[in-house]
Amino acid sequence: MFEINGNLKVDINKFKKIYTTVFDKNISPQINEILDLFEFDTTKSSYEDVIEEYSKFENDSLGSFEYLDYSDLRLLSKRKWNNKEALIIGNGKSNYKTTVQIKGDLLDKVLKKPSPVISRNWSPDEQKALMVEVSTLGNKSEINWFFISQQLFLKGISRNARECQRKHESIQYVGLSGNPKAKFKGTFD
């Protein structure tokens, strides 16, 4: 289990069962499949409560972004692993590049991918290879599943949840597959 926010947790084993279908066959999972990945507090178990819980978390994260050096970028998310904080930042449509950056206690590293700008147009392999290698976190495979789970969660519920559409039109959370520098050596700046 991965705790996303207080009452919201993702079941990694359930996620792995639909991973192949989503990425290899390019078939979007159904809403009930997505929600079945998550485990909630018994007092927050409805579809609407899950959206409310996640949206509240995202709003809190956005409000905490005060780094002037990155004022031209959008803060996509704020995450903590083992009490270490990281910021995921993107500038989706600037200069026809999408930048995903993790900055914080863990590392300070940027990967840039030339157009197409919108990440949903990238191939599954490119999506999986985009996320930087978070070498200080220990279990890289768990971090990989965490990011992909976020992507599926947002993709699944955004069709019916305006609260989650507002910030994620042009970016998806992606996971690491192998060494991105080695696999796509000419892709990243």
Swiss-Prot record:
InterPro entries: Homeodomain-like_sf, SANT/Myb. Residues 121-172 form the Myb-like domain. It comes from the Eukaryota. This is Myb-like protein T. It comes from Dictyostelium discoideum. The lineage of its organism: Eukaryota, Amoebozoa, Evosea, Eumycetozoa, Dictyostelia.
